[in-house]
Amino acid sequence: MVPSVMEGAPQLGITSTDTSSAGVPPGLKLIPTDRLDRRTDEEIAAWLQTRHPVTSDKNVWAFWHNGYTNMPPWVQRNIINWVRRLGPDWTVHLLDRVDGSATNVSHYVDSSFFPECFNNNTMDGPTVGQHSGDLVRLPLLWLYGGIWIDAGSFLFRHVEDICWNKIEDPESPYEMAGFVIEMRPGVEVMLNGFIAAKRGNPFIKRWLEIFKKLWDGATNVQGFHKHPLLRHLPMLCPPIDKLNLPPQGLNVVMEQFTDYMSQIMSFERLRKLVDPSDGFNGPEYYSNKMLLCSALQETFYFQLVTEWSGTKQFNLLSTKRKGEGVVKDENWHAAENFVHDALANTATMKLSHGPPGALDSFLADLWDSEEHHGKDNEDGTFAAYLRYGSVHFDQTREMVPIKMGWPDEEVLEAGVLEPKK
């Protein structure tokens, strides 16, 4: 039996009248209900645990290594809301590595795409789930096309409006899309939590080849920054001032941080590589064929305005918005501004668990804890209102892409899997 994901909270679906008294906030408009998936949350939850045929490139891919029923309830609600928001034209595939599961990734991707440690279940270390997801996402996009979204993400805008309409437009130069952030002073780096491309994309193919190669003989990512394919690249070092990080910065050694981000480092290799054997030009592709938007605006805006404090985010969203005893004090208005700002001005909200220990607190960790399992959707709170708005509101703003030029850093002329000499 599929467990309910509502934890006693009112259903987010079609009958809610949450905005009837407050009206629609500035920068937003109501989505007609006929554009939404009208099934109950329980029906969508059951549907997510069955295998669905791939009939087009309009796929949203996500992964949870030990399956839907082992997801924290807040993550389950994320995926359910994607299905409801995206409607019938898009298929959300939530894959796993559970033996006998109808949604096991092995039904979609041949073992030849994965390293030995993945196929033999010998990956180790504290980030097996995260890096299993890294290994899965690129083969899925290469084989089937669509959009990879990390399961810990809220979706505040339809994926067609974020990027897909432009990828599908024959008059548009764009073939891939994602979000970039300054990971070294003056250097914008594309993240891997939101990746869009049609099947057979040439950049995706080479990217997955590089990342898979890192895993030869490995069972975790430790030391990947020293791998022959990556060792010529500068290590990641996010600028504290530009990201509005806490004064102490990230509580992590940069070598370990760079290893954790090794799939992003594989991207970095490829975007600065020209392959003379087949003419592939990474800088040209990155500059002209990728639709890139600011991650600080489109996925980490909530972090930027709270100094990356999970505790601060938790307290804002746990604030009572309506009901008996509500006092509209300074904290209430801060919570309202936070939620309205997120709903109107950022495309997604990605909650992560790591790198482990990098920050003093992560909202994902707080919502993971059993004592807080319903806090992301507790009746009458701003968290529940954020959930409601993520399904029922459309943004009126236009997203503005960033134009990337030719990299200022060294461009490597070599084969995709050829180390720098």
Swiss-Prot record:
Biased composition, class Polar residues, residue ranges: 13-22
Keyword Transcription appears in the UniProt entry: no
Record EC number: 2.4.1.-
Region described as Disordered: spans on this chain: 1-26
InterPro entries associated with the record: AfumC-like_glycosyl_Trfase, Glycosyltransferase_domain, Nucleotide-diphossugar_trans
Keywords (A to Z) from UniProt: Glycosyltransferase, Transferase
Entry GO CC: membrane
Keyword Transferase attributed: yes
GO biological process: mannosyl-inositol phosphorylceramide biosynthetic process
One MF annotation (Gene Ontology) recorded for this entry: mannosyltransferase activity
Pathway: Secondary metabolite biosynthesis
A Pfam family this chain is assigned to: Caps_synth
UniProt record similarity statement: Belongs to the afumC glycosyltransferase family.
Function: O-glycosyltransferase; part of the gene cluster that mediates the biosynthesis of the brasilane terpene glycosides brasilane D and E. The biosynthesis starts with the activity of the terpene cyclase braA that converts farnesyl pyrophosphate into the sesquiterpene alcohol trichobrasilenol. Subsequently, trichobrasilenol is glycosylated by the O-glycosyltransferase braB putatively using UDP-GlcNAc as sugar donor to yield brasilane A. The latter then undergoes two rounds of oxidation performed by the cytochrome P450 monooxygenase braC.
Name this protein carries in UniProt: O-glycosyltransferase braB
Record organism: Annulohypoxylon truncatum
GN (gene name): braB
